[in-house]
Swiss-Prot record:
Heme binds at C446. GO terms for biological process: arachidonate metabolic process; xenobiotic metabolic process. PANTHER family: CYTOCHROME P450 2D6-RELATED, CYTOCHROME P450 508A4-RELATED. It comes from Cavia porcellus. SUPFAM superfamilies: Cytochrome P450 (SSF48264). GO terms for molecular function: heme binding; iron ion binding; oxidoreductase activity, acting on paired donors, with incorporation or reduction of molecular oxygen, reduced flavin or flavoprotein as one donor, and incorporation of one atom of oxygen. It is a peripheral membrane protein. The keyword Phosphoprotein applies. The gene is CYP2D16. This is Cytochrome P450 2D16. The modification Phosphoserine is found at S249. Its EC number is 1.14.14.1. It is found in: Endoplasmic reticulum membrane; Microsome membrane. It holds the Pfam family p450. Its cofactor is heme.
């Protein structure tokens, strides 16, 4: 067969272009509906991919919000997307219309991670019986963790003591606390999943943290959005082989830990941890093809909990210490409350939180100000729904701009500043605000919220009970502007920890 001539090539190119334009027009039809949300005009074949900075999506969405309003539409190649902004619209979408908006979109790149067809996990699971079963199990396991043995609070308290000991080794010298915070939170998750902790210099924990950090960068890239929007590209071997390599390495390490752990499981013994509890449910469900308790779901659930549970809490703690050295008056007030309620002898306990309104307000304000997951996890509509009068068709990817709620000028007195008074009334009592939703809202609210609250309170109070933190002498004042990725990290900084 001979090569195509120039005229033939031109004809083929024109035919392909016409075909792509027709496909593009077909996918744009819903944008012409009377009540479909407005939005920027998509580029044929690309949609609005080039108009969104995926490393700082919240910033892009804020600019588009000023132009198109609280509910606007985008198109990622041929995937319809709606972005919801502001407290009223986000609450309507996630809470009032939760039955319609709690599904998850299919992300084709996830097929490269090596999980079988029965694996959904919890975070990315479709809104249905399997998700309900796994969420119920996970919430119950977190609540009943260590029944008859060490409680989860004991694990966190003991790890806080190890963290303080590690900080003591750096006392008086400038250092970056990020790595130590990562290791401490990693050990809490490891105790929950594997009933074990790692020494801070263990090569396994160092590799886990390295792969997790790289995974954040991978998932923040435009490349991932393009591949999820044009999954046909994943059929190209050289493309598929390079996608999500760090995440695959992270999963492989977790698989190794899981295999080591499972050799010690005994069905007739009380569960040591969440994994044992899952294996027990698998044992009970043998022969039940409808059960979501299977090996592949266990692998994905472990990776979900390890990744999401570790990163968000350690990053928030890193923000907390940064804000304490930038606001020494707030730090002193927290320490005064710690001294009054807890003292310098015993360890902090969760029961102390109710008697420490200022400290509680500071922790909440750290979460609000840091705003570390500004766009949340994407949802998908499972049927036609309405938000703020706009019609959102079934199968639309839905982003909720949580940053627009946490920084809403109509709700917060000083939305762009660190101000613990946002969570205190005139008498100094703690007040939780409706617009405080760093964990999202509705049925898909982060299932690890109770654990995160416990870790933040116990680690934060333990550190400020033992140390005073400051900007190292001779160093410039660090910035309180974050570095946007999938999770907003604080700009690199060092501090000095001085024993009190």
């Amino acid at each position: 067969m001979g090569l195509l001539t120039g005229d033939a090539l031109f004809s083929v190119a024109v035919a392909v272009a016409i075909f792509l334009l027709l496909v593009d027009l077909m996918h744009r039809r819903q944008r012409w509906a009377a009540r479909y949300p407005p939005g920027p005009v998509p580029v044929p074949g690309l949609g609005n991919l080039l108009q969104v900075d995926f490393e700082n999506m919240a910033y892009s969405c804020d600019k588009l919000r000023h132009q198109f309003g609280d509910v606007f539409s985008l198109q990622f190649v041929w995937t319809p997307v709606v972005v919801v902004n502001g407290l009223l619209a986000v609450r309507e979408a996630l809470v009032n219309n939760s039955t319609d908006t709690s599904d998850r979109p299919t992300l084709p790149t996830n097929a490269l991670l090596g999980f079988g067809p029965k694996a959904q996990g919890v975070i990315g699971a479709y809104y249905g019986p399997a998700w309900r079963e796994q969420r119920r199990f996970s919430v119950s396991s977190l609540r009943n963790f260590g029944l008859g043995k060490k409680s989860l609070e004991q694990w966190v308290t003991e790890e806080a003591a190890c963290l303080c000991a590690a900080f003591t080794n750096h006392a008086g010298q400038p250092f970056c606390p990020k790595a130590l915070l990562n290791k401490a939170v990693c050990n809490v998750i490891s105790s929950l999943i594997y009933a074990r902790r790692f020494d801070y210099d263990d090569p396994m924990v160092l590799r886990l943290l390295e792969f997790l950090e790289e995974t954040l960068r991978e998932n923040s890239s435009l490349k991932i959005q393009v591949l999820n929007s044009i999954p046909l590209l994943l059929r190209i071997p050289c493309v598929a082989a390079k996608v999500l390599s760090a995440q695959r390495s992270f999963i492989a390490l977790n698989d190794k830990l899981l295999a080591e752990h499972n050799t010690g499981w005994a069905p007739d013994q009380p569960p040591r941890d969440l994994t044992d509890a899952f294996l027990t449910e698998m044992h009970k469900a043998q022969g039940n093809s409808e059960s979501s308790f299977n090996d592949e779901n266990l692998r994905l659930l472990v990776s979900d909990l390890f990744g999401a549970g570790m990163v968000t809490t350690s990053v928030t703690l890193s923000w907390a210490l940064l804000l304490m050295i930038l606001h020494p008056d707030v730090q002193r007030h927290v320490q005064e409350e710690i001294d009054e309620v807890i003292g310098q002898v015993r360890c902090p306990e969760m029961a102390d939180q109710a008697h420490m309104p200022f400290t509680n307000a500071v922790i909440h304000e750290v979460q609000r100000f840091a705003d570390i997951v500004p766009m949340g996890v994407p949802h998908m509509t499972s049927r036609d729904t309405e938000v703020q009068g706009f019609l959102i068709p079934k199968g639309t990817m839905l982003f909720t701009n949580l940053s627009s709620v946490l920084k809403d000028e109509t709700v917060w007195e000083k939305p762009l500043h660190f101000h613990p008074g946002h969570f205190l009334d005139a008498e100094g009592r703690f007040v939780k605000r409706e617009a405080f939703m760093p964990f999202s809202a509705g049925p898909r609210i982060c299932l690890g919220e109770p654990l995160a609250r416990m870790e933040l309170f116990l680690f934060f109070t333990s550190l400020l009970q033992r140390f005073s933190f400051s900007v190292p002498e001779g160093q410039p004042r660090p910035s309180d502007r974050g570095a946007p990725y999938l999770v907003v990290l604080p700009s690199p900084y060092q501090l000095c920890a001085v024993l009190r």
